Amino acid sequence: MDQGLSTGAHQDTDGLRERNTRVDSTVGREALTAVGEGEIKDKDGKASKTFGRTPDGTVFTVPQTHDMVSQLLLPSEPKNFGDLVVLILLAGHIMFLWALPAGAKIPIFAVTYLFWRLAYNAGIGWLLHNQSHHKTLIRWAEKTKVFVNPATGENPHPKLYNWIKRELETKIPQDYSFDNAPIEYNTWLVFRRLVDLILMCDFTSYCLFAIACGHQPVDESILMTVLRWSAGIVLVLFNLWVKLDAHRVVKDYAWYWGDFFYLIDQELTFDGVFEMAPHPMYSVGYAGYYGISLMAASYKVLFISIIAHAAQFAFLVLVENPHIDKTYNPPPPRKRSSTCADSSSTLPTDLDTPTAPTPSEDQTPNATYSYSVKPPQPVHNLLGLHNLDLYRTTDSSIMLVQLLVFSITALTPSTPWYQLLFVVLAAISRIWYSVGIGYILRNQSNTKSWTRHFVKYGDTPQEAWNQWKGTYHLSMILCYSSFIAAVWKMYTFPADWGYGLVLFRHVLGAGLISLQIWTSVSIYESLGEFGWFYGDFFFDDSPKLTYNGIYRFLNNPERVLGLAGVWGAVLITSSGAVTFLALLSHILSLAFIQFVERPHMQKLYGRSLRQDAGLVKSLKRSLPPSLKQLHGSVDKMFDDSFEFIEEMLDNARPKLAAGVNTFVKDTTALFQKYPARVTIARIDADLAGFDVRDYALSVEGTSALSFEESEKNKGREGANARMPLDRRGDLKDLTFEYGSPIRVKWTAPLHHSKKDWIGLYRVTDNTSREVTRVSSQGRWVATNEGAYDNLTCEKGILTSDVVIPSSERQGQDPCEFASGEIVFAGDKLFWTQGVFELRYHHNGMHNVMAISRPFEIRIRRSDEDETISDGDSFVESAVENALLPVVRNCFDRDPEIAPETVDEQFGTLVERDGKFAKRVVFAVHQMFGIELAAEVVKADGNVRNLAWRICNAKKVLAPYSMSRSNGTTTPLEESKE
C-alpha cells in the first residue's frame, strides 16, 4: 500500500548534506508503478487507457476502480454480496459494543482489534510475502481452476466461478471482462475484497475500542480539555488528508499492492504527501491514531496505537521493502569487456584495491604508497555493532571510554557535586564535538590542513582519512556517552506513574529518542560511511549531488529530527540542567551546519545546491501569499544574523589563533621536559503399494581430487593399506568441487506421488535410513513442478516423469518407470566441506524411499612448495588459476556476477549480497590458510587482485609458516667452517 520509495520520480540536483554518495544505477519503485487505474489525460484532454503487464508479458487494459470507502458507503456505487458482508460485520461490531456490559467492553474490543491488526500485518503480510517470492495466490488460482470458464469442462467449481464473475463485474461495469482478464488481475481483484474486509474491520474495531476507553480525566481544566480535543481533531484531519492525498497519487493499484501481481506500463511523477515524508502511509499516515488517543484521554488507546504502528513498520520492513528492492532495484547488468586486454586496462588502481604490481615495483620499499585523491574502497567500516573490531585501536578505545564513563556513572552517588561534574563533562564533550571538530573540518575545507599534516610525515591521504574517521567516531561516542551519563545522574525514578503527565512525558520522550535513532540510521543509509564522516572534505572526486532516502524530504534532517532524542531526555527528566545541555547541543549543531557544512557545500557544489527540500516545497505550496512573504523576511533576518556572527568570528580569529598556538607550544615543551609513558517425523499412511526397490538416486558433479589421492603414500598406514583401492564403476569415489552444481538422476514408479521431493543432508545428520528427522533447511527440490505453492523448491528441476521403457530396467521386474533430473546449486548446497547424501522422500512427507551414495565436497589445499618460485616470489598465475573456478562456483556460475577471466570484474550483486563474498572467504582460508574479511573480496573486485592480495599475505606470513619451504621449524646453529 505504501509507495514510500516512489516519491522521487524526478530528483533535484541540489541540496545540502548529501555528501557525494555513490550513485546507484538502478531505479526505484517509481520507475514502473503507481497510479495504474487512474484516469490519465492525453494531449487532447481525453481519458487515455492504462495498460498492465503480467509476468509472462501479457498486456491488458486496466479498468478504473474506486476506493473501498466510496464503494461501501456511497449509494451511487453499485453494491454486491461482498459489500453487504462487510457492512453487516461493521454493524455487528457496533451492536456488540452497545450490548456488552461496561466492564467487558475494553478487554473484548482490545482483543478484537488486535485480532484484526494481526490479520492485517501477519495474515495479509504472509499472503503478500509468498505471492512476491512464490506467486502463491496465482498458483492457488491455477490449481483450483476457479477462473477457468466452465464451458471448457475443466472448472470443477462452476457455481463459484459464476458467483465471483457476478461479484467482480458488478463492481467494475466498464472496460472489464472477467473471462478475458488475465488470471493475475482477477486474483488481485479477489484479494482486494479480502483486504477491504480486514482493513474496514481493523479501523472500526480501533475506533470502537477508543470509544470504550474514552473518558474525561478527573480535575482536568476546561482549557486542557479544549487543547486536547483540538490537537486530536487536527491530527485526525491531517491523517485524513494524508490518506486521501496518497490515494490520489497512487490510486487503487498501489493501495492494494497491485505490483505483487502485475505491473503498470507507465511512469508518473509523485507529489503531494509523497514529497513530505518517507513511506507517508505508514509514518505520518498514523498521526490520527495518536489524535484519537488524545481525544479518548486513555493510555490504553495510546499503547495499543503504538503497538499497531510498530506492527505496521514491521510489515513495511519484512514484506514491502524486500518486494520493492526485488522488483524495482535489481542489480544493473554487468559491463563485460570485449577482450581480456580491455578488461585489464580498466582495473582499479586504488591503494586498497591493488593491481598486482610488477616484481620491480614490489621490491621497492614505498612502492605501495599512493597519493591518489580518490576515496578508498570501504572495506572495514566503523559504524555498527557488526563492524566492532577490538583489534582496531579506535574500537578498543571507544569500548574503554564507554566502560569508564558508565562505570563512574554507576558507582558514584547522584549528589549535586557529581551531577554538576557530569553536566560539565557533557557540555565540554558537546563543545568539542561541534566546535573542535568543526574547526578541524573548516581548516580541512580551506587548506587541507589535516591531510597536509599526515603527508608531511610521509603518510598518505588515505591514512589521514582513516585517522580522521577514528577521531570523529571517538568524539561522537564520547559526546553522547557523557550526555547519557548526565541524564542518568539527573533522572529521578517517579514515585507515582499515574500522577499528572509523568507517564505521558516518558512515552513522548521515548518516542523522540526513537525518532532520533531512526533519523541517524536513515542518514547513514543515505550517505554511507563516506558521507557520514564528511568524506568530501578530504577527497574531491567528481562531486555530484544525489538525493535519496531521507534527503528527498529534508535538506538537513540532523537540524531538527537528528536532535529529537536530546529533547526526549528533557521530557523524561524534567531537569533544567538537561534542558541546558539540549539547548547547547541544538545551538552548536545549527552553528556547525551554518559555519562548517554550508560554506563547504556551497564551495564544492555551487549553484547545484537545492534551496528547498520536498517537505518545504509542499508546505510553501499550501501557504497563503502573506505567509510566504513572511517566510522570506524571516529567512533574510536569519541570514543577516549569521553573517554578522561570522564577521565577528573572522575578526577575532587572529587573536584566538595566536593564543591557541602559544598554548600548544607551551604544552608541547612541557611534555618534552616531563615525558610520561525437534524434529517431528511425519509418517505417511499411504505407503502401501510402493516398493522402495523401485526408487533410485544417482549423483553426478564436477570431480575434485579426493582425500585418498591427495594423502596417499604418506607412509602412515600399515604395509597392507598403502596401496590404493581398486575403485571402478559404482565403487569409484564421489568427490566434488566446493560449490559446483550437483546433478541428480532419480527413478520412481509411474504412479509415484507428484509431491515427492529430494533433500540434501550430511551423512551424519540422520541415524534412521527410513525416516528423515532433520530439517533440510531449504536444501530440497521437488520432483515435479506445480506440486507445491513455492517457486523456490522448483528451482533446479530439469526433467520430470520421463517414461523409461521396461527394456532398460535390468535385473528387475520388466515394467516402465518414471525418471527425472534435478540440479542442486547455489543456496541449495552446503557451503562447507564434508560428506553428504541425497534422500528421496514420499508425498511431501519425510518417509525415505531412496538414498544416494555418499559423496564428498572438498577444497584442495594449495601446496606452498608449488606456489613458490625462485627468490621466494609467489607465482600469482598459479593462484589465479586455482582461484578462478572456485570463485565461479562461489558465485553460482551466474553469468551476471561470476567472472569468465581473472581480470573480469565481479557483478554488482556481490556487493549487495554478502553471502557470495563469505563463500570465497571460506574457500581462500581452506585453500591457502589466509583468513580475509568479506569486505576485502568485494573491494578487490576481480580474481587477479584477490590473488595478488593472497600472495602478498603469504609473503608477509611466510616467516611464521611451518612448511618445509621455509626451512626447518627450529633454528639450528650454523656449522663453523
UniProtKB/Swiss-Prot annotation:
Residues 105-107, 215-221, 297-298, 419, 493-506, 597-977 are cytoplasmic. The chain crosses the membrane at residues 84-104, 108-128, 194-214, 222-242, 276-296, 299-319, 398-418, 420-440, 470-492, 507-527, 576-596. One of its GO terms (biological process) is methylation. Residues 1-83, 129-193, 243-275, 320-397, 441-469, 528-575 are lumenal. Residues 1-10, 361-370 have a biased composition (Polar residues). GO terms for cellular component: endoplasmic reticulum membrane. Its main location: endoplasmic reticulum. Residues 341-360 have a biased composition (Low complexity). Residues 1-23, 328-370 are annotated as: Disordered. It is a multi-pass membrane protein. Keywords: Endoplasmic reticulum, Lipid biosynthesis, Lipid metabolism, Membrane, Methyltransferase, Phospholipid biosynthesis, Phospholipid metabolism, S-adenosyl-L-methionine, Transferase, Transmembrane, Transmembrane helix. It catalyses: a 1,2-diacyl-sn-glycero-3-phosphoethanolamine + S-adenosyl-L-methionine = a 1,2-diacyl-sn-glycero-3-phospho-N-methylethanolamine + S-adenosyl-L-homocysteine + H(+). It is found in: Endoplasmic reticulum membrane. Catalyzes the first step of the methylation pathway of phosphatidylcholine biosynthesis, the SAM-dependent methylation of phosphatidylethanolamine (PE) to phosphatidylmonomethylethanolamine (PMME). Belongs to the class VI-like SAM-binding methyltransferase superfamily. CHO2 family. HAMAP family: PEMT (MF_03217). This is Phosphatidylethanolamine N-methyltransferase. It comes from Penicillium rubens (strain ATCC 28089 / DSM 1075 / NRRL 1951 / Wisconsin 54-1255).
